Structure formats: C-alpha cells, structure tokens
Amino acid sequence: MSHIPISNTIPTKQTDGNGKANISPDKLDPKVSIDMEAPEFKDFAKTMVDFIAEYLENIRERRVLPEVKPGYLKPLIPDAAPEKPEKWQDVMQDIERVIMPGVTHWHSPKFHAYFPTANSYPAIVADMLSGAIACIGFTWIASPACTELEVVMMDWLGKMLELPAEFLACSGGKGGGVIQGTASESTLVALLGAKAKKLKEVKELHPEWDEHTILGKLVGYCSDQAHSSVERAGLLGGVKLRSVQSENHRMRGAALEKAIEQDVAEGLIPFYAVVTLGTTNSCAFDYLDECGPVGNKHNLWIHVDAAYAGSAFICPEYRHLMKGIESADSFNFNPHKWMLVNFDCSAMWLKDPSWVVNAFNVDPLYLKHDMQGSAPDYRHWQIPLGRRFRALKLWFVLRLYGVENLQAHIRRHCNFAKQFGDLCVADSRFELAAEINMGLVCFRLKGSNERNEALLKRINGRGHIHLVPAKIKDVYFLRMAICSRFTQSEDMEYSWKEVSAAADEMEQEQ
C-alpha cells in the first residue's frame, strides 16, 4: 500500500490572515461543550412555541403585505457572523425587529394570492421531530422508518382519494406513491419516466435510429391553461411540448387527438400528456375522461396534475372531477397546499415506477445495502438524492385531524368562495370571469383591462388584503383565493369591503 501523507492543512501560525489568534487543536478542552445544552434548548423551544402560537392566533391583526423595499434587511444585521455565541433571547428579539417587517403573511385570512400553502400545529410539531431525527432517507437502510412510513402514508392518502388500486403499494402490484418536494418536481419526474419508456419502445422498433434522432422527434402535450412548470419540465427534459387550445379553459379529448394526429403526420413521436385538474388561472378541470383514453390509444404517458384541487377529492362530492383517473400513469397533488400539511409535501403516485427508477438509477457502492429490492429506495424516484422525513407531518395531520375534519376544512373554504362570489355579483359594477370552483373566485370590474389593473394596484397598495391577477384570452381579472385555515365568514365580508372601497375610490377620482 502506498503511503498516504497526513494533511498539512492544520493551522500552525499564531494568527490567521486577519490577525486573530488561532487556537491549536491540541489546546481545545474536549470536556467543554460548544453546543446548546438540553435545558437551554427546552427554554428556547418553549419560548419559540409561545411566539408561534401568538403569531398565528393574532396574524389577522398584522398588515398582510410588508411595506419594506428591496435591501431593507442588510442594514439591520452585522456585516459578519459573531465570533462568540450570542444569547437566544437576543435572537428572539430580532425576529420582530429584523424578520417580521419583511414577511408576507401567507396564513392571514386577508391573504388571497396564488393558492394556499398549508399550515397546522400538528404539522409544525412533526417538522420539529423530523429536524431532531435529521435523517437523510435516500435508501431504506438510511432510515427504515422514513421509507416505510412514507409507503404507508401514501397508501392512506390514496385510499382517501379512492385512487385505483394500481396506484397503491398495498395492492401488491407495481404501483406506489412517493412524496416529492413540489408538483413541479412531479411533472418533471413523470416526463423523464415517459421519455425513458418511449426511448426504449422506439429503439426496439427502429434499432437503426440513434438516441439523439429519437429525442428530436419526441413531443408532449398540455392545455394552454397548464402551469408554467409543465413548460419548464419540457425545457429541462430536452423535449418539445405543445400547448393544446382549451375550450372554456378546459382541454378536450378531441383537441388533444387532433394535435397528436397532426404531429404524427409530421413525423414526430407523441409520448406524454399532462392533464390539469384545477388550473392555476381559474381552477378549471381538463376533461380527463376524454383526454386519458386518447392518450392510452396513442400510447402516451398520462400525468395528472391536481396540485391544488386534489385535496378536495377526499370529499365524495368532488370526485366526479377526477373521472377517468384509471387511464392515468401518474397522479400528483399537494397536501402542502390545502390539506393542512406544511410545505413541502407533494404526493405522487405511479402505476409503474420502474420507468422512473430505471431512468434515474445511479448506484454507487456506498449507497448499496443488503435489503435492496425488499423496499423502495426513494432516491431512485426523485431528482435529488437527499430527502427529509416528510411522511411524519402527513402521519401527524391525518391522525390528529382525521378525514372528517380535513373534509370540513375543504368544504368551509369552498363555502367562503361562494360567499365572496355572491357579494361580487350583487354589485352591478363587477362580474365573474370564470365559474367559481373550489376555493377560488375569478372576478373583475366590468370594462377594460386597464381599469382592473388599476383596481388591483389600489387594493394591494392599501395593504389590507393581497390578491394577484391572471389573464385568459386577453381578459385580465383578479383572483380571490381562500388561503387561511383561520378564515371566517366575517373575513370574507372584510375582504369584499376592501375591494368595494378601492372601486369607490377609483370612481371618486374620475
């Protein structure tokens, strides 16, 4: 064996480059702890729990949008990290001084932008435990509980939605679920699995074609209302994606088939289609029962993106919107949007994960273990290697709320949206821009896009509520999303009064 020299990078100088004294490793006292001790941690954690509870229970009183300008934070903190440890009490004081002035309060009942991001006390506590265990569950052996709880939780969740048995690990077939970070990751993972599947199929039919030639012919499909992450998945996957014109904001099977047939006639190879259930712009639902069979007929991988609306499928009255799910190859929704599970927790199911596993399979010796094949190694199901113990918060939320209370949460939000919609149509100045679906209301002032742009600017400028816009077929409108678990009927009345007051101001200034 060749001689391996001992590292000579241990500092021997009395001072570093800045003139500060170096401490020789042999002079460090091993009995002196550099960590926060358990009693101090308990005091710190109890104080933080009190702060969190006070913050959330009184979040309604805070201005939903911060008034700071870019760069506000840097002058509030030192230019460099402290040489000596500070007191945790000082850190707590700086939360209000440094952090809170720049926070947009997503869990305020006055926050109506985007779609909700979930939050609950059980999920917060679960994240504390996950942080304490601090495992990186890329393989079964890296932390068996991390993998096995995820398998079971994905089956629990799939049963709550009444997904076909082929998607569930408990069915004994190929299928199973995995927790991804976001719906964007799920869309990309599905695309890469579909790409690998189609490459294999085409190579068997045309062994004379090289991979570059085949990839240049692949084309995928989505509605013109699909999320921007679908287009991004195509860019990252190095394939063409074609936008299919929607009908009343929804993709129809006939339009998808026409696009496929046109591309086949031009020598392209269709391989993948994303069907959106609950679009970001207006919460519209593609016709899965039409598009799925079309995709199956042409041997496309059908991926269903139900990032927001999927949570509602735990309620029987909304499951008709996922009619045709048996035709899908993969299905995704985000419990971290609407099911009271803190970010990040994006649930994805695959009928045949082997296409994804084989596409991502890089198997160095240091990641191998004796139990390979007996349980999933989730590193093969995702883009990154590392993964947190995310199943804990799903387990805590499902147990501590129960299905009935989660259903009640969804239904409350849907009723609040109807309440706001009723207030809107009762004012002759306003109109709905789309059908009210789930917890989203799309509305606008009658008249020009410019009037509505001015209205939104005025609403957000007042800072009492926060909305974002959307545009479909050159019609600009405002989106009122019900986002907070603290929302009450009175909050919807307050938000409507803010919208109405902003419109009043515009009229007075004309």
UniProtKB/Swiss-Prot annotation:
Residues 1-17 have a biased composition (Polar residues). Disruption phenotype: Simultaneous knockdown of Ddc and myc restores increased dopamine levels and the induced male-male courtship observed in the single myc knockdown. Belongs to the group II decarboxylase family. Hypoderm isoform is expressed only in hypodermal epithelium and the CNS isoform only in central nervous system. Expressed in the adult head (at protein level). One of its GO terms (cellular component) is cytoplasm. Homodimer. Pyridoxal 5'-phosphate binds at A183, S184, H227, D305, N334. Induction: By ecdysone. In larval epidermis, expression is rapidly induced. In adult epidermis expression responds to a pulse of hormone and there is a time lag between initial exposure and appearance of DDC. The modification N6-(pyridoxal phosphate)lysine is found at K337. This is Aromatic-L-amino-acid decarboxylase. PANTHER family: AROMATIC-L-AMINO-ACID DECARBOXYLASE (PTHR11999:SF167), GROUP II PYRIDOXAL-5-PHOSPHATE DECARBOXYLASE (PTHR11999). The active site is at H227. It comes from the Eukaryota. Substrate binds at T117, H227. Residues 1-28, 358-384 are annotated as: Disordered. Changing H227W: Decreased specific activity to L-DOPA and 5-HTP. Decreased ligand binding affinity. GO terms for molecular function: 5-hydroxy-L-tryptophan decarboxylase activity; aromatic-L-amino-acid decarboxylase activity; L-dopa decarboxylase activity; pyridoxal phosphate binding. It comes from Drosophila melanogaster. Changing V264M: In allele Ddc-R11 and allele Ddc-R18.
